[in-house]
């Protein structure tokens, strides 16, 4: 960040070949409901954020720094690998990508559209989602390994409020009910409380964001 004024935010970086080394970000207050494509074509701005998911003839770059994932607290009944895999496998088969264009199906923890030394990471790494296997068979293996129905008391699926994933959480929970006859509650809390509970281990299952951090390949 180089400077900020009423005229916008000014960003700079070291010059490198033909790459852009300076940028001004301006809030558009006169868009009149125009799409990102219309803003670029009609107002001649260089780039605009697009959350519609609508195909366009303009060049686009997909961007995300967050992948939503199921986290299981292993200091609980979910110490069983087979049980975690059973629930994860059922969830993958059941959940639908939320509408609105803000979400896309994840192909791994690291989002699409990221490059490392100029190489497209996803294209180079491929689809790294594990092949978990049949959820019912995994659940039976967990039961054979000592998991008891009596151990499933007071389990909830925790997620932060305002995430836009309430329906997805309900879909996942319904799949667990249908596949395993397991009845968990869905618990939404404020983001601050959600983070505190994750850090303290005060959860059994969480639908949590894995986000970019400094020093990562993100």
Q: What is each of the regions a protein language model found here?
A:
Residues 1-3, 56-65, 70-81, 116-134, ...:
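Short, solvent-exposed loop/beta-turn-alpha elements that line the ligand-binding surface or hinge
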Residues 6, 16, 140-212:
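Ligand/substrate-recognition segments at binding pockets and active sites
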Residues 7, 12-55:
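Ligand-site clamp/hinge motif
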Residues 12-14, 29, 61-86, 90, ...:
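A bilobed periplasmic-binding-protein/Venus flytrap-type ligand-binding module shared by bacterial periplasmic
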Residues 34-39, 52-58, 192-218:
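Pocket-flanking alpha-helical
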Residues 41, 45, 77, 83, ...:
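Sec-exported extracytoplasmic/periplasmic mature domains
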């Amino acid at each position: 960040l180089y400077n900020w004024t009423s005229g916008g935010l000014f960003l700079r970086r070291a010059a490198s070949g033909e790459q852009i080394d300076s940028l001004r970000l301006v809030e558009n207050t006169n868009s009149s409901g125009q799409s990102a494509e219309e803003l670029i074509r009609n107002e001649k701005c260089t780039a605009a954020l697009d959350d519609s998911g609508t195909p366009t003839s303009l060049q686009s770059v997909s961007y995300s720094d967050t992948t939503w994932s199921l986290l299981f607290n292993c200091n609980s009944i979910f110490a069983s690998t087979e049980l975690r895999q059973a629930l994860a496998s059922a969830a993958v088969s059941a959940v639908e990508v939320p509408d609105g264009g803000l979400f896309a199906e994840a192909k791994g923890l690291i989002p699409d559209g990221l490059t490392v030394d100029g190489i497209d990471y996803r294209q180079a790494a491929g689809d790294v989602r594990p092949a978990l296997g049949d959820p019912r068979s995994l659940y039976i293996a967990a039961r054979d390994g000592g998991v008891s129905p009596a151990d499933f008391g007071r389990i909830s699926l925790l997620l932060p409020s305002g995430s836009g994933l309430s329906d997805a959480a309900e879909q996942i929970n319904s799949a667990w009910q249908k596949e395993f006859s397991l009845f968990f509650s869905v618990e939404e809390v404020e983001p601050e409380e959600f983070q505190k509970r994750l850090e303290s281990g005060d959860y059994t299952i969480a639908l949590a964001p894995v986000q970019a951090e400094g020093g990562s390949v993100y």
